[in-house]
Each structure stands twice: as C-alpha cells, then as structure tokens.
Amino acid sequence: VTLIAEQAVTITEGLSYLRDLMVTYAKRTPVTSVAVLGNAPLGPSDIRAQAIDDSDLVIRVNSFVLDVPGEPRCQGSRADVVVWNRITRPTRFTFDRYRERLYLLAEPMRFHGRPEVWPQSWPPDLGFVPLPNAEILPRIGDELDIPWRAEKLAPTTGFTAAWLAVNLFPECDIRLSGFSFIDDPGQTEWTYQVGGSSPVAPEHRIEAEARVMTDWLKEERVSLWR
C-alpha cells in the first residue's frame, strides 16, 4: 500500500504485473526516476529536455513529439512506454521504432460500451497491452471524486499515464511536463506540441484532474517541468 495525496492506493497483483512490465522497458534499473509527458506545447529548454532524457523510465502519450538532432531541445528524445488510445492522431514519432517500446492501450470508454475500432494507422504486427479498466478506472474515478460510472466519464490519457507513474512507482522521483490543464483547468480546447488543436472531450473532467495533480506536486518527489 502506498500513500498518495493522503489516499491509500492498493497495488494489486494486476497492477504489480503492469509495473514489472513497464520496468523491463526502462533505460536503467532499478528505476528511481520516471518522466511523464503530456502533449501541450513546450518551448525550448535544454535543462527540461535533459531532465527527461536522464530519467530511468520515460512515458509518453498519444500524439507525442520527440526532440530531433539539429532542432532546439524541448521535450527529450526518449519514449520507453507509450500510453495511447484508439483515436490517437499519429505523429511521425508515434510508431517509429515501435518494436523497442511498450504500448499500453487506454480505452476507458470501452468500459461504458463504446465499440472497438482498429485504426489503419496501426502497424499490423503492433503488440500492445490493454490497461486493465477494472483495476484502474475505479481507483482514478474515486481519486478524482467524479460520478464516472453514472455519467460515463473517463480520465484523459495524459492523466492516466501520470497516475500510473505516481502510484506504481511510489519510491521514484516523478517528472511531469506538457500538462496544460494544471495552469488552465478551465480550458475547453487542447493545443498540441505537434501543432493543431481539438476540443476537450465531454467525458473528461480536467478541473478534477488539475486538482489531483496539484496535490501530487505537494510531494517532494513529484515535480512539474514547465
């Protein structure tokens, strides 16, 4: 049992297995630092990029972007674990070197009956592991304190990735970056590092996610890299 923001989170057998699987893709073990990247625009910062690349485990989500040689460094160049969903708009990085990464499929709306889709953008031999809704969604919903069952709500993919890092790696430093809703919980539109924008889906409650993330940041081991 770990204490996160004064709330006990029980690490079940399924979540322990998920942690072990994530660790196998880490750059170094034992894992002492985990970086989690959302996709909000980030300006150039060698310090931020280095902190991310120096992390033992780097988790990215959906339409992520990586630093490339010859361009200003912003968000680092590694992706060990990718948490993504079926409606992700792939970037040129999403499935690049996919055989070297762990892909965790977040599909919370399947819990509420949304049909399964298989995007043509996925590599035909893409191996992935679905996140266990039964173990994750109730815990996240309770921590967010939202009527997720009654109103068919779902956490954002970015928050899900951060929740996994904070809760499955309680002994580690957690480095968060690219989460715009922490500073703007009332936003109704996402803007992306890769470019473009989209509306915040109606099933999300980013005000609650911002509140929980702000609570995490009160812990010395959790930091936000703006």
Please tell me what each predicted stretch does.
Residues 2-226:
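Metal-ion/cofactor- or nucleotide/acyl-coenzyme-handling active-site neighborhoods
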